[in-house]
């Protein structure tokens, strides 16, 4: 049998193993060395056992796969060729590791004899992603010297590790040439596969790993702690885990601080603003117990509160990761939040602190007054619920706008919010949003900053084949407005931080054959959205705002609330 045919046989086993662990999507970049993997992925698609997605840029492809993994809640495989093609996946791998999203990265490689000898497109790929993957598998070149069950069990174990500790698997797969003259009829009947034909004929993983059965056990002193003064702080949570938190805490009379990523409808909205009030913040720090649900908080004021709190501290999160950057002495519950709530019944009692409610109500009217009725960055964040479809998904980019939404916005209970707040980079945000849409059957609204869009501009190509209404808001404040928050001299800030670009995006949308609109008023926007939601395609909506409008409003609100005197 030819080398190319056995390369395909080897690749068939790899991809078969991955599909048994829930892989339904293969994201593929063009390349020669990855041909055996690409053609086997295509065979799975022809058999209607998987879907293949393509993109010409590996960096964007990695983030597209990340978005797919986020919205589909399944592991997503990526196939790339050797060389810097593999290296371009690094940013998405870092983000997936930080957020616990499951990617399986298949990097084709040159065989050993072509490494470190001047051969073309041959770099050091083994373990190239350092400690970011939860499992790294460096396969040998395909050879019948290895029994097929070894290959399956090696990959099966890596997938099991991923199931236990969510994140990235890196599988480096060297192939020798030739790559193209495989006999299709010989691949499935190769004698090397004979020992595993029974396994190939069903759709189960190699090993039957029994799930660890764990019930959440009530804290032994819960009857005492639930009578104390408590604060619930809800960070990034799945939609399933977000339900019921506010009702539980309100029954207890406890204060609830919610992150925009939590999916929890806030009973005390605008916490990032009202926590700037020193008087209320100091009273809140007198709590006996803080319970952190989830992690990764956007709000600077919530993070400052957590850093300063010195009392009893509990953490509830389903991952085994460290999720307390302030290193409290704490009690840790590794559990889903709704399971934990069920195991810890609330005690009905009156609120122990009334000032946050009074200040939150004051903020509501004060923010409305400050943001005004014009269509601008702050008003868009404050009234974000106006632009969202009932059954949609909101993807929030990074930098200033996510902070404005977290500080000024309110979302309905359980409304899905997806972010890249692991490493919080501005790279790959358009690509991630495209992947989110592809992995769901729901309308998607993406809110992206102008610099983020420029950074990932070619990922607009990924929106050409969407199958549901997709709205891409580009908030154009002519540069990195987040840096207006820095105490840097204005001329230096403009040249080295904000970097104004004086660009608009109409021609970019045209280049990728996407619908485009630039509304100037809320009435304009309402009309544009009505049309956009009626089409199963992508629409780019550019909102041009003053360079410092959003940041100035944000700073002004925080400053004025910090001095407010509110009676409980």
Curated annotation (Swiss-Prot):
Catalytic activity: isochorismate + 2-oxoglutarate + H(+) = 5-enolpyruvoyl-6-hydroxy-2-succinyl-cyclohex-3-ene-1-carboxylate + CO2
Keywords tagged on the record: Magnesium, Manganese, Menaquinone biosynthesis, Metal-binding, Thiamine pyrophosphate, Transferase
Cofactor binding, note field: Binds 1 thiamine pyrophosphate per subunit.
Disulfide bonding pattern of the chain: none
Pfam families assigned to the protein according to its UniProt record, in alphabetical order: TPP_enzyme_C, TPP_enzyme_M_2, TPP_enzyme_N
Coiled-coil residues: none
Cofactors, names only: Mg(2+); Mn(2+); thiamine diphosphate
Pathway membership, UniProt: Quinol/quinone metabolism; 1,4-dihydroxy-2-naphthoate biosynthesis; 1,4-dihydroxy-2-naphthoate from chorismate: step 2/7; Quinol/quinone metabolism; menaquinone biosynthesis
Function summary: Catalyzes the thiamine diphosphate-dependent decarboxylation of 2-oxoglutarate and the subsequent addition of the resulting succinic semialdehyde-thiamine pyrophosphate anion to isochorismate to yield 2-succinyl-5-enolpyruvyl-6-hydroxy-3-cyclohexene-1-carboxylate (SEPHCHC).
NCBIfam families named among the record's database cross-references: menD (TIGR00173)
PANTHER family for this protein: 2-SUCCINYL-5-ENOLPYRUVYL-6-HYDROXY-3-CYCLOHEXENE-1-CARBOXYLATE SYNTHASE, PROTEIN PHYLLO, CHLOROPLASTIC
Subunit relationships: Homodimer.
Protein name, as recorded: 2-succinyl-5-enolpyruvyl-6-hydroxy-3-cyclohexene-1-carboxylate synthase
Native species: Mannheimia succiniciproducens (strain KCTC 0769BP / MBEL55E)
Biological classification of the source: Bacteria, Pseudomonadati, Pseudomonadota, Gammaproteobacteria, Pasteurellales
